[in-house]
Amino acid sequence: MPLLDSFTVDHTRMIAPAVRVAKRMKTPCGDDITVFDLRFCKPNEERMPSKGIHTLEHLFAGFMREHLNSKKVEIIDISPMGCRTGFYMSLLGTPKPKRVAKAWAASMKDVLNVKSQKDIPELNVYQCGSYKMHSLKEAKEIAQNVLDRGIGIMNNKKLKLSKKLLKGL
């Protein structure tokens, strides 16, 4: 099985909250696609609660589009990581990590301004596969934590695992 890009970086050296360019590629038509690692929690030390990350998923996708989409950037998808330490964001375009961090911070402020559970988009049996598994309180705690700690930028060169180490794992 091929080794995925996300498993060639040293998770013990990741900072959080932080933005990392996980992958850049060109489509056959010449469009640029960038995948960002938006790391909310330090791997193997912290993780977001299930209800909070699910609510954040519903809110974050819309708020990030409001703050980041432009003539040169269009978000394709924002999805939570299975390890519950962050989200992957795939988009058309090549925005700088600092611009992504600024949009992320603005989105977290937007989360804090959501008044009630009723204001969570697509929170119903028809549009959500686990519509009862939500917590606005937990989503707000996650957002506040990001804002309190500040959003850094990760350097892939500093995180890269050596070929020797990878062979031994």
From Swiss-Prot:
GO-annotated biological processes: quorum sensing
Name under which the protein is recorded: S-ribosylhomocysteine lyase
Organism: Sulfurovum sp. (strain NBC37-1)
Top-level taxonomic group: Bacteria
Keyword Metal-binding tagged: yes
Cofactor note: Binds 1 Fe cation per subunit.
Molecular functions per Gene Ontology: iron ion binding; S-ribosylhomocysteine lyase activity
Principal EC category: lyase
Subunit structure: Homodimer.
Sites where the protein binds Fe cation: H54, H58, C128
Lineage summary: Bacteria, Pseudomonadati, Campylobacterota, Epsilonproteobacteria, Campylobacterales
Gene: luxS
Family: Belongs to the LuxS family.
Keywords: Autoinducer synthesis, Iron, Lyase, Metal-binding, Quorum sensing
EC number: 4.4.1.21
Known function: Involved in the synthesis of autoinducer 2 (AI-2) which is secreted by bacteria and is used to communicate both the cell density and the metabolic potential of the environment. The regulation of gene expression in response to changes in cell density is called quorum sensing. Catalyzes the transformation of S-ribosylhomocysteine (RHC) to homocysteine (HC) and 4,5-dihydroxy-2,3-pentadione (DPD).
Reactions performed catalytically: S-(5-deoxy-D-ribos-5-yl)-L-homocysteine = (S)-4,5-dihydroxypentane-2,3-dione + L-homocysteine
Required co-factors: Fe cation
Tagged with keyword Iron: yes
